[in-house]
Amino acid sequence: MKDDATGADFLLSGYDYELPEDRIAQHPPVERGLSRLLVLDRTTGERIHARFADLAEHLPEGALLVANNSKVLPARLLGHRPTGGKVEFLLLTPLPLVTPLAAGPASGTVEPGWCVAEVEGLLRASKPLRPGDTLSFGDDLRVEVVHKGEFGRSMVLLFWRGELATLFAREGHLPLPPYIRRADGDEDRDRYQTVFAREDRLGSVAAPTAGLHFTPSLRETLTARGHQWAEVTLYVGYGTFSPVRCADIRDHAMHREYVEVTAETVEVIRRAKADGRPVVAVGTTSCRVLEGVATAKGTLEPYAGWTDIFMYPGYTFKVVDHLITNFHLPESSLLMLVSAFAGRERVLATYREAIEEGYRFFSYGDAMLLR
């Protein structure tokens, strides 16, 4: 589907809306799956208020649901400088792409038993950091600053001793979104992961939040009703929370994220398309994988690499027929994606109704089905 974009659709100000602070979910529902679902027919504009547990009642027959199987890494480290000053480091490079260097860095040799890799991350400290500064995060993790970039993004040398995923699980904190105004807790270790998350896909710094609503029971119900499943991988980057800053959104430089689509998933989607069965993206991350690969390659094919696709009104969707998604921040690229799918004015009108009806917004909030 291609939305007939107008000049107003390209203005950043066209994606602003007023959201009361108490509509931003600070915690997950008491139980996984106890979320609300707002169904929007993007052709007629009809809206239905439902429960997410009743998703099967609102999906077309024989739908193929495509979910993101990436897992959130406790990627936020709290440490100190040699002088004792406190520092924070957030690993941005997906864990599977952290490749130990064959030889020690130019700044010195690597101690026996230690590994080192050049990675990207966010650094925060009470006093400015400079190239060459060394930061410690427990006994087995440390970082040396190589180059500082914009908005805190930096290239660093990451030194570790032992198994890296285990070290982050022990020392790290889940990087909850900035609009969740509390520290991460034990409940987040479970509830900020989806039922699709795979251990060998550990490396996202944010959850693919549409997947948070699904339970094993709901998956079984959907399968029993004749729906099918497929998986893709997108390692969600911190750029997902970055606002669009350009007055004309077409000037926005989109952040890139690493994605994977297997030959098996491609074949399942091709068969669904051939049979006339709709492809339902579980979340904007799954949507970005499918549309990003199809746009870059001209067709959907197996792929492992980067995508920086930016979808806004006027974009023609090539793979995705329906979209399950949460409610998104004002002036965000994700709100623009949803507007490309269902129309900006229709989406904003739906958001206003959701606010009036008491829906919970953002990562731990309620969901929409755009069909």
From Swiss-Prot:
Ranges in a coiled coil: none
One MF term in the entry's GO annotations: S-adenosylmethionine:tRNA ribosyltransferase-isomerase activity
Subcellular locations according to the entry: Cytoplasm
Enzyme Commission number, as recorded: 2.4.99.17
Major location category of this protein: cytoplasm
Keywords: Cytoplasm, Queuosine biosynthesis, S-adenosyl-L-methionine, Transferase
Pfam families membership: Queuosine_synth (PF02547)
Record-linked InterPro entries: QueA (IPR003699), QueA_dom1 (IPR042118), QueA_dom2 (IPR042119), QueA_sf (IPR036100)
Keyword field contains Transmembrane: no
Gene Ontology terms: biological process: queuosine biosynthetic process; tRNA wobble guanine modification
GO cellular component annotations of the record: cytoplasm
EC class of the enzyme, as a word: transferase
Reactions that this protein is recorded to catalyse: 7-aminomethyl-7-carbaguanosine(34) in tRNA + S-adenosyl-L-methionine = epoxyqueuosine(34) in tRNA + adenine + L-methionine + 2 H(+)
Metabolic or biological pathway: tRNA modification; tRNA-queuosine biosynthesis
Oligomer and partners: Monomer.
Function (record text): Transfers and isomerizes the ribose moiety from AdoMet to the 7-aminomethyl group of 7-deazaguanine (preQ1-tRNA) to give epoxyqueuosine (oQ-tRNA).
Family listed: Belongs to the QueA family.
Annotated protein name in UniProt: S-adenosylmethionine:tRNA ribosyltransferase-isomerase
Gene: queA
